[in-house]
């Protein structure tokens, strides 16, 4: 696996150096692990670094993020899915592709370098990059579309900086088949408590009436609840 990172950030309200840590890979290469000042130097602005490591025996859901101070909390984070051609659970679902990834993240209106808002909680919970803050009911929400009768493997990824989230989808159970990139015995639940850096795969059967259903990700503190669509997205048949 190779990831070339170029540091071009010139916004001095945030840290301009960076590192990248690929979370969950047992890659065994200190130089590519991305822990700033522990086993690597930060990438200086205007420079680049090639992360190069192997993970031939790992499959599942992973994430990456900055590992320099609080830069992660300002948005430098994302996900990976490594598909297993011999997935033991492949008979349990019909659909698994880039539209079946669900990311949860906390979003702060003040850059971490400028304020101390973290103790108060995030302004917004973002689901696949979209969400509302209190008093802003006009902001768009993520819509995830499904077809009635199909079974979907969703990859749920917590990119949270601080709070954990309780995740659920109105009217639907979830059959968990993977935890932190490890295939597991499937367990049916109606909600998942997911902490920073954790990943789950679950199978959702689209067996309800054609309608819209709330997807909910309630944070452990801060702007909790679902008034005006905060901490929410939409599952649409």
Curated annotation (Swiss-Prot):
Citing just one GO molecular function, the answer is: hydroquinone:oxygen oxidoreductase activity
List the keywords (alphabetical). Copper, Disulfide bond, Glycoprotein, Lignin degradation, Metal-binding, Oxidoreductase, Secreted
Temperature note: Optimum temperature is 55 degrees Celsius. Thermostable. Retains over 84 percent activity when incubated for 3 hours at temperatures between 10-60 degrees Celsius.
Binding residues for Cu cation 1: 21
**Entry's pH dependence statement:** Optimum pH is 6. Retains over 72 percent activity in the pH range 5 to 8. Retains activity above 89% after incubation at pH 6 for 72 hours. Retains activity above 61% after incubation at pH 5-8 for 72 hours.
- GO process terms (BP): lignin catabolic process
Q: Where does Cu cation 2 bind?
A: 23, 65
Q: List the disulfide bonds.
A: 73-161
Q: Catalysed reaction per UniProt?
A: 4 hydroquinone + O2 = 4 benzosemiquinone + 2 H2O
Q: How is it used?
A: Could be used in the treatment of dye effluents. Able to decolorize structurally multifarious synthetic dyes, including metal-complex dyes, in the absence of redox mediators. Shows the highest removal efficiency for metal-containing dye Acid Black 172, followed by Congo Red, Remazol Brilliant Blue R, Reactive Brilliant Blue X-BR, Indigo Blue, Neutral Red, Naphthol Green B, Methylene Blue, and Crystal Violet. Displays higher decolorization rates towards Acid Black 172 when immobilized on composite nanoparticles (Fe3O4@Chitosan).
Q: Which residues are glycosylated?
A: 11, 128, 164, 207
Q: Which residues form the Plastocyanin-like domain?
A: 4-86, 99-237
Q: How is the cofactor bound?
A: Binds 4 Cu cations per monomer.
Q: Name one Pfam family in it.
A: Cu-oxidase
Location in the cell reads:
Secreted
Q: Which PROSITE patterns match?
A: MULTICOPPER_OXIDASE1
Where Cu cation 3 binds, per the record, is at 67
Can you name a GO cellular component term?
extracellular region
Q: Which SUPFAM superfamilies match?
A: Cupredoxins
In terms of domain of life, where is this protein from? Eukaryota
Cofactor names from the entry are:
Cu cation
- How is the activity of this chain controlled? Activity is promoted by magnesium, Fe(2+), nickel, zinc and cadmium ions. Completely inhibited by IAA (cysteine protease inhibitor), PMSF (serine protease inhibitor) and DEP (histidine protease inhibitor). Inhibited by CTAB, SDS and EDTA. Inhibited by lithium, sodium, aluminum, potassium, calcium, manganese, Fe(3+), barium and mercury ions.
* Enzyme Commission number: 1.10.3.2
Role played: Lignin degradation and detoxification of lignin-derived products. Multicopper oxidase that catalyzes the oxidation of a variety of substrates, including phenolic and non-phenolic compounds. Has highest activity towards 2,2'-azino-bis(3-ethylbenzothiazoline-6-sulfonic acid) (ABTS), also active towards hydroquinone, phenol, gallic acid, catechol, guaiacol, levodopa, 2,6-dimethoxyphenol (2,6-DMP), tyrosine, ferulic acid and veratryl alcohol.
State the family named in the UniProt similarity comment for this chain: Belongs to the multicopper oxidase family.
The protein, known as? Laccase
């Amino acid at each position: 696996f190779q990831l070339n990172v170029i540091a071009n950030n010139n916004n001095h309200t945030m840290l301009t150096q960076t590192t990248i840590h690929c979370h969950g890979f047992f890659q065994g290469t200190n130089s590519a692990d991305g822990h700033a000042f522990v086993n690597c130097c930060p990438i200086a602005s205007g420079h680049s670094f090639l992360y190069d490591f192997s993970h031939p025996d790992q499959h599942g859901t992973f994430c990456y993020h900055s590992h320099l101070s609080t830069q992660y909390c300002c948005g430098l984070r994302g996900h990976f899915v490594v598909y297993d051609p011999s997935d033991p659970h492949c008979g349990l679902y019909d659909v698994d592709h880039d539209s079946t990834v669900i990311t949860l993240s906390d979003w702060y209106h003040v850059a971490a370098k400028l304020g101390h808002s973290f103790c108060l909680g995030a302004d917004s919970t973002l689901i696949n990059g979209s969400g509302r803050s209190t008093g802003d009911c006009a902001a768009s929400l993520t819509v995830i579309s499904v077809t009635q009768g199909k079974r979907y493997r969703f990859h749920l990824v917590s990119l949270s900086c601080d709070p954990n989230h309780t995740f659920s989808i109105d009217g639907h159970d979830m059959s968990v088949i993977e935890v932190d990139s490890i295939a597991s015995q499937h367990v049916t639940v109606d909600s998942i408590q997911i902490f920073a850096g954790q990943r789950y795969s679950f199978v959702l059967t689209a067996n309800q009436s054609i309608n819209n259903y709330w997807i909910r990700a309630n944070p452990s503190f801060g702007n909790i609840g679902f008034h005006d669509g905060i901490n929410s997205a939409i599952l649409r048949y």
